[in-house]
Each structure stands twice: as structure tokens, then as C-alpha cells.
């Protein structure tokens, strides 16, 4: 009887493979599975973010002081000519427009243990579902609030998501947010005054330390937020806004905002150790299933890394330890002539 092939078999392949994450490579190294069976399974099953949420929820260590992080990443498909769901879009890593598949991700951070978990994601494919990245964020937000009911205090997100619609949704739930503003965001110190770019504001020495109250264009009259000027380098200054009007420290705002880089760490790890962006299948369904499996693999690696206090990279590299010892003891290909 043939072994039943499931997505967990594919996950196992992604977990142990070091460089090549193609179905062909999987089939070449499996004694029981052919490429056709693997490809057929990946085109027929329909994995969704629900699988990730269920797996991640059992691993979460929750905190009332928790953080919810939203951001997006692009799976590089610049050499693709026929993969469905690939579109030209801005890549923050590349600092330019590339061909790829966009993913909006959500990460939960426990500041008490300094641990984090990916808890949800959405694939950005407006030609198929008509949804913007902000629509996907709000879908995940509603799931967090009404379905998962995860405890947290603060939301961190990129300037792309600093829209009134998102900010008001967070405020309605009594949560705080910190997010950078684009340098051309229109702002004023008085709702009756003329608006100007946020990067044109003048700052007193005291305001540089404690922030200033501002009004964003299109927000309701009297709706004030706290703005902080964070000097990142000689060539970069961030303007971070929060609805926590009690916040009076630029240094603390910098520390709060720095937590957002946990989601960048997740993106980097997922791409480097799970083959997240390595799928070459043309079918959008196979691509979606591959992404879902890669997410599950990261959750598993993260679980082991937290239990052993190792990094995900060390865990992945450790799979080669036995191979290296054996090859050094008795190499398959010798450096020396017989």
C-alpha cells in the first residue's frame, strides 16, 4: 500500500533540506515519492493561514504587555516568467520594485520573555481577491480581536499601514500604537492651522526629549497624537507617532519602536532556513501551499530553538553535523589520489 502523502511530508522536506527546496530535489531523495505525486498533492490541497494559527496558538506564551507587529515582505521571483500571483511591487530589502509574491505578516512578541511567534499572514494578490495590504491587515486584526482574543497592549507597524482607518480600528479596542510616518505626511500643531510636511516641523530642545502633540490631516478635529523625532543616523530621521499621550520620552519611544524589528528577523529567518521564497511551481495554489508549509516549518524550528536556547540557524546547520563527521572520517570523495 502506498504511503499517504500529506503536507507534513512536504514540511519535513523543507525542514531538513539545506539549499535546494524544489519538488524535483524532494522526489530525487525520497524512496517512496515521485515528483508527479508531490506536484499533484501541492496543486490539490488547500492550506490556509488557519493551519498556522492553530499550530502557533499552542506555542504562544501570552502577556498582557504583549505586542502585535504588522509588516510585509516580498518573495523574490525576479526570474519568473509564468508563476501565478507574481506581480511587480516595492521591496523594502531591495529598495526598488521587483517581481515577486507579497505577504502581509503578523507577529506576536512577549516582552517579558523576549520571545516572538508568527501568528498569521495573508498573500497579497489584488488581481485575485481585490484586497489591498491594509485590507489584509484589518482582516488579521479582526481575527486577533474577535476570534483568537490574544492579550496584548501595543501595536507596531510600518509607515505603509499608518492610515486613519487602521489607527482608528486600534484605538476602538483601547490599544496603543507606535508607527513611523512618511516624511511627506501632512501635519499641524493646531487643527485650524495650515498643514505642512512632518519633516519640515521645527523642534525645541524640550520637544526633542519629550515629543509634541500634533494633528494629522483627515483625522477628526481635536484628535491629537504624540509625535517623536528619532535620529537614526546622519542620513536618516524617523518620525514616530503614537496615541499614547502619556508617553513623554523619546528614548522610550525608540525602545518601543525597536521591537518592530522582530518581524524583520522572522522574515529573514523564514527565507533563509525554510525555503519560503524558493518554490518554482507555476500554480498559485501550489505557491500558497508552499508558503503555508514554510510558515509551519518556521514555527517548528522556533519551538525547538526556544526550548534549547539555540538559534534557528544553529539548529538547521546542526543537521549537517553527523554528515560532516562521517565524511571527515571516511570521505566519499577523497582529496588524495589512490
Regions found by a protein language model. Name each.
Residues 43-113:
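Active-site-proximal, Lys/Arg-enriched surface segment
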Residues 30-33, 45, 59, 257-260, ...:
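Alpha-helix boundary/capping residues
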Residues 2-3, 7, 12-19, 64, ...:
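Single, function-defining residue in the core of a domain
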Residues 38, 58, 227-230:
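Positively charged, low-complexity intrinsically disordered regions
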Residues 1-48:
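Gly/serine-rich nucleotide phosphate-binding loop at the start of the catalytic core
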Amino acid at each position: 500500500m502506498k504511503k499517504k502523502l500529506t503536507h507534513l511530508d512536504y514540511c519535513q522536506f523543507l525542514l531538513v533540506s539545506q539549499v535546494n527546496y524544489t519538488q524535483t530535489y524532494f522526489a530525487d531523495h525520497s524512496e517512496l515519492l515521485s515528483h508527479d505525486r508531490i506536484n499533484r498533492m501541492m496543486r490539490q490541497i488547500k492550506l490556509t493561514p488557519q493551519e498556522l494559527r492553530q499550530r502557533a496558538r499552542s506555542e504562544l506564551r501570552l502577556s498582557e504587555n504583549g505586542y502585535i507587529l504588522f509588516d510585509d515582505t516580498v518573495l523574490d521571483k525576479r526570474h519568473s516568467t509564468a508563476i501565478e500571483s507574481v506581480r511587480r511591487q516595492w521591496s523594502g530589502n531591495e529598495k526598488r520594485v521587483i517581481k515577486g509574491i507579497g505577504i502581509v505578516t503578523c507577529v506576536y512578541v512577549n516582552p517579558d520573555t523576549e520571545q516572538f511567534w508568527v501568528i498569521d499572514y495573508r498573500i497579497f494578490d489584488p488581481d485575485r481577491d481585490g484586497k489591498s495590504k491594509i485590507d489584509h491587515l484589518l482582516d488579521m486584526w479582526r481575527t486577533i480581536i474577535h476570534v483568537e482574543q490574544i492579550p496584548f497592549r501595543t501595536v507596531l507597524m510600518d509607515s505603509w499601514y499608518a492610515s486613519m482607518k487602521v489607527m482608528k480600528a486600534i484605538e476602538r479596542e483601547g490599544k496603543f500604537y507606535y508607527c513611523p510616518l512618511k516624511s511627506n505626511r501632512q501635519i499641524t500643531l493646531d487643527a485650524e492651522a495650515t498643514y505642512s510636511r512632518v519633516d519640515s516641523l521645527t523642534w525645541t530642545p524640550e520637544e526633542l526629549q519629550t515629543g509634541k502633540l500634533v494633528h494629522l490631516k483627515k483625522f477628526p478635529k481635536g484628535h491629537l497624537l504624540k509625535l517623536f523625532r528619532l535620529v537614526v543616523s546622519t542620513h536618516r530621521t524617523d518620525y514616530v507617532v503614537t496615541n499614547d499621550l502619556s508617553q513623554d520620552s523619546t528614548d522610550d519611544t525608540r525602545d518601543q519602536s525597536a521591537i518592530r524589528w522582530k518581524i524583520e528577523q522572522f522574515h529573514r529567518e523564514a527565507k533563509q532556513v525554510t525555503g519560503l521564497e524558493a518554490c518554482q511551481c507555476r500554480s498559485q495554489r501550489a505557491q500558497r501551499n508552499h508558503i503555508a508549509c514554510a510558515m509551519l516549518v518556521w514555527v517548528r524550528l522556533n519551538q525547538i530553538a526556544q526550548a534549547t536556547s539555540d538559534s534557528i540557524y544553529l539548529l538547521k546547520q546542526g543537521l549537517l553535523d553527523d554528515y560532516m563527521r562521517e565524511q571527515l572520517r571516511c570521505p566519499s570523495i577523497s582529496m588524495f589520489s589512490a
